[in-house]
C-alpha cells in the first residue's frame, strides 16, 4: 500500500533528514512510528500525504505518486498533524465544509466518536475550545472519513488519561483489512495494546520494522532473575520496581512487549538487536 524505495529527503543541502530509506506499510495493521524528536517521523508522514516531496528515490501510495497530489489519492488519505490549524467554525460547520472531500465520510460515525469523547454539542465554536477538545474533534473526524490511509502525528497530545483510553478503543474499532493506520508518537506508553506493527527510527534510518508477534517471539522482556543465566542480555534498565531486561528469547518464552524498554534498547544497542532479527529471518 505504501512503499518507500531509496528515499532521500532534506530541508537543507547540508543535512539529510532521511537517507536511502526503504520501508513498507501494509493495510490491515495499526503501525506505531517511534523515534526521538528530530528523527523525521512527521516528515515521513508528510511525504506519504503529498505535503512534502522526496529529492531522490521512489515513493508509491496506493499505486499513486504522492507528489502529483491526485484527487483520487487525496480523498483516501487523512493526515492529522501535531499542530492543529486554527478554525473559527462550529463543529457542525466544520463537518459541512470538510466532509465532502472524503466520499466515504460517515456522519453517524463522527457523531458516535464525539459522543465517546464526551463532546455534547456540534454548536461549539472550535476556537473557543481547549487544545484537548480540539484534538478530540479532529481525531473523531479523521476516524469518520473512513479513508484507506489514516496518518496521525502525536494524536494523544493534549488528551487526559480517560480520553487516551477512549482514543485507543476507537482507533482499534476503526481498523479493517483494507485500512492502514500509522500513528507517530514519542509517548510510547500510549500505544500499548493498540499497535500490531512497530517501526522505530534512529539516526534518520529505520532501526526496526517488525510485527509485535515477531518481536515477542525473538526478544524476551523480563525482570532480572539472579538465578537465570540462560538468556543473553541485550539491555538492562534500573527502576524502582527492579531491573528490567531485554534478552534474546532463546527458549521461546512468552512475555509482554514493553515498548518503552524496547525503544531504549534499540537506541543503546541497535546493531545487536538488528542482528537477532536479520539472522533469524535468514534462517527461515
Predicted regions and their residues:
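ABC transporter nucleotide-binding domain
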Residues: 167-182, 186-247
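The feature captures the beta-strand-to-loop junction immediately N-terminal to the Walker
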Residues: 34-36
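Helix-to-loop junction immediately C-terminal to a conserved catalytic motif
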Residues: 49
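A short, flexible loop at the N-terminus of ABC-type nucleotide-binding domains that lies
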Residues: 1-21, 27
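Catalytic Walker B motif of ABC-type/P-loop ATPase nucleotide-binding domains
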Residues: 150-154
Amino acid at each position: 500500500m505504501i512503499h518507500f524505495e531509496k528515499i532521500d529527503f532534506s530541508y537543507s543541502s547540508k543535512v539529510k533528514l532521511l537517507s536511502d530509506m526503504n520501508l513498507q506499510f501494509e493495510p490491515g495493521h495499526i503501525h506505531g512510528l517511534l523515534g526521538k524528536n528530530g528523527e523525521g517521523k512527521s516528515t515521513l508522514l508528510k511525504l506519504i500525504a503529498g505535503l512534502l516531496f522526496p529529492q531522490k528515490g521512489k515513493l508509491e501510495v496506493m499505486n499513486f505518486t504522492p507528489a502529483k497530489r491526485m484527487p483520487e489519492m487525496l480523498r483516501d488519505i487523512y493526515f492529522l498533524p501535531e499542530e492543529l490549524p486554527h478554525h473559527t467554525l462550529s463543529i457542525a460547520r466544520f463537518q459541512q465544509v470538510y466532509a465532502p472531500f472524503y466520499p466515504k465520510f460517515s456522519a453517524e460515525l463522527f457523531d458516535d466518536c464525539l459522543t465517546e469523547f464526551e463532546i455534547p454539542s456540534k454548536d461549539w465554536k472550535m476556537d473557543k475550545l481547549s487544545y484537548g477538545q480540539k484534538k478530540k474533534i479532529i481525531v473523531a473526524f479523521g476516524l469518520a472519513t473512513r479513508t484507506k490511509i489514516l496518518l496521525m502525528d502525536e494524536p494523544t497530545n493534549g488528551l487526559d488519561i480517560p480520553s487516551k483510553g477512549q482514543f485507543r478503543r476507537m482507533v482499534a474499532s476503526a481498523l479493517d483489512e483494507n485500512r492502514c493506520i500509522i500513528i507517530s508518537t514519542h509517548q510510547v506508553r500510549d500505544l500499548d495494546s493498540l499497535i500490531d506493527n512497530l517501526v522505530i527510527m534512529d539516526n534518520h534510518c529505520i532501526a526496526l520494522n517488525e510485527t509485535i508477534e515477531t518481536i515477542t517471539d525473538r526478544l524476551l522482556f523480563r525482570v532480572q532473575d539472579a538465578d537465570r543465566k540462560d538468556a543473553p542480555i541485550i539491555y538492562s534498565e534500573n527502576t524502582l520496581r527492579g531491573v528490567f531486561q531485554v534478552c534474546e528469547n532463546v527458549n521461546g518464552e512468552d512475555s509482554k512487549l514493553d515498548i518503552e524498554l524496547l525503544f531504549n534498547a534499540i537506541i543503546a544497542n541497535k546493531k545487536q538487536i538488528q542482528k537477532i532479527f536479520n539472522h533469524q529471518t535468514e534462517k527461515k
